[in-house]
Amino acid sequence: WRRMRRAEPNRAHYALAELEQLGAVSGVITQNVDGLHARAGSSRLLALHGDLSRIVCLDCGQDEGRESLDTRLDAANPGYLARLEDEELRVNPDGDVELDEHYIRDFQMVPCLACGSTRLKPDVVYFGESVPAERKALKDAMLAECSALLVVGSSVAVMSSYKIVLEALRAGKPVAVINGGPGRADAKATYLWRTGVGEALELMLDAVDV
């Protein structure tokens, strides 16, 4: 999470936010959990799979900001993070690391601020979990209100996002795909643009902002 927090929005994030401000995009549904669309200025935004900047209690549902949790974890485990950094641990693409057993044994978990449970997790949808009902409802509302669906920079490999494409097509709405490589929705797309996402969105901005 700390590495992701240091990431900055790219030209595609900013272009989508500008297209929304110009009225060409009615909202953004993202599979990403990095919060970069919000930082770029997208206002009507649904993070379908959650946001790593939030923590949720598995017992009572109370949520907490990740920075707040980090502060509490640092207080409960003084010097722990510095010792880990000295190890120069390799972080896997999914964010996991392999730790020696003594690091796990010595770690003190902090409780939920509401119920005291220590069963806390990032507020993201892991593989095998379902998208929460309230997010599905917002997704349905956004899809019902739009006139077309634009898929940007995604292979649409996950079923929760592929379903959005299928739902749009069933509703008779055109689906456009912009992506630099092949994806699951390509064969069903009304329009397919195989190119870099940032460049494509800037060309769209030029066409809209006249």
Residue ranges of predicted features:
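Conserved catalytic alpha/beta core of Sir2/sirtuin-type deacylases, generalized to analogous enzyme cores
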Residues: 1-210
